[in-house]
């Protein structure tokens, strides 16, 4: 059995080829590279396309579907629209359309939004959207890897999304625009609200630079800013403050869910959550009274492949989310 998992992230696309529960290869394409090259031609270097049994696809916010759905049944790529979601480059759209046109069997993973009824109704009442599709994939990877039925997952990268899993189902959480900051994205505060109202900046532009990048002079574009800030942690006072502030912010978000997390299991993921120098997970552990573990690697792409594999093996529910395939 051969499956492929797709993670549509802020800086690009990551794909995982898995055969019989074993990861065979992982490759990445920056969004700018995708605009100039065929994703499927790149994938073909790693696997015969005719041998793929199923692909698990993440795309954008996933707010137009509420089930893990056969790509043939999905309209408008599974989104309501592409507004208000951060910087748009177009690479993910090109990859999605290539996959759909190829007739390779595929399922599209939804985001977590108020239409997903398996979550606690209070979170759906509070927030219109909680997470994009790859966060479900990361959660499922953590669920399968560590075997926890109850845990908090915090994915820290360009943005930070923190989710609570109870009894093997996603209970709720905090989206990138609520609560903790990431490197690029974060919640909109009073100053940004004023700038939006005075038409100095759009709400989407404000969100896209409301992360700790606002503390530094280090914006190097969507793909390279995190490396600029993290590599200068010990050299630049603004970068030091930015990273320390991110750690504080994420720790606050995790701790805000701990009263619902009686097993006290916490899993950190994402390029910043797994960053070794400075060691972000160790810095966060100092602020958390619990069992803090790290999910290394390309957890979103691997998790998408795990979802595809388990669907082929007959699963009709993933972390409480129904499967329509």
UniProtKB/Swiss-Prot annotation:
Segment forming the signal sequence: none
NCBIfam families, A to Z: methan_mark_12 (TIGR03281)
Family under the similarity heading: Belongs to the UPF0285 family.
Protein name: UPF0285 protein MmarC7_1666
Native organism: Methanococcus maripaludis (strain C7 / ATCC BAA-1331)
């Amino acid at each position: 059995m051969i499956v492929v998992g797709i993670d549509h992230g802020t800086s690009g696309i990551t794909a995982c080829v898995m055969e019989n529960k074993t990861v065979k290869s992982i490759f990445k394409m920056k969004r700018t590279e995708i605009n100039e090259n065929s994703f499927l031609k790149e994938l073909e270097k790693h696997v015969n396309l005719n041998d793929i049994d199923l692909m698990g696809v993440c795309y954008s916010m996933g707010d137009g579907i509420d089930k893990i759905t056969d790509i043939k049944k999905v309209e408008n790529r599974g989104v309501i629209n592409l507004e208000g979601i951060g910087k748009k480059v177009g690479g993910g759209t090109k990859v999605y359309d290539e996959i759909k046109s190829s007739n390779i069997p595929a399922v599209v993973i939804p985001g977590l939004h108020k239409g997903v009824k398996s979550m606690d109704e209070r979170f759906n009442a509070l927030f219109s959207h909680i997470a994009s599709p790859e966060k479900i994939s990361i959660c499922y990877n953590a669920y399968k890897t560590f075997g926890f039925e109850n845990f908090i997952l915090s994915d820290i990268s360009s943005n930070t999304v923190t989710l609570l899993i109870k009894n093997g189902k996603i209970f709720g959480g905090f989206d990138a625009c609520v609560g903790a900051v990431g490197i690029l994205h974060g919640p909109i505060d009073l100053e940004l609200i004023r700038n939006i109202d005075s038409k100095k900046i759009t709400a989407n532009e404000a969100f896209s630079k409301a992360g700790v990048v606002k503390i530094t002079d280090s914006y190097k574009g969507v793909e390279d800013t995190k490396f600029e800030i993290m590599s200068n942690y010990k050299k630049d006072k603004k970068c030091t403050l930015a990273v320390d502030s991110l750690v504080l912010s994420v720790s606050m978000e995790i701790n805000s869910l701990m009263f619902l997390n009686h097993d006290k299991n916490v899993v950190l993921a994402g390029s910043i959550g797994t960053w070794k120098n400075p060691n972000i997970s160790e810095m966060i552990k100092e602020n958390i009274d619990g069992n803090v573990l790290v999910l290394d690697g390309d957890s979103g792409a691997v998790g998408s492949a795990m979802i595809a594999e388990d669907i082929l093996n007959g699963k009709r529910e993933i972390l409480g989310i129904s499967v329509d395939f």
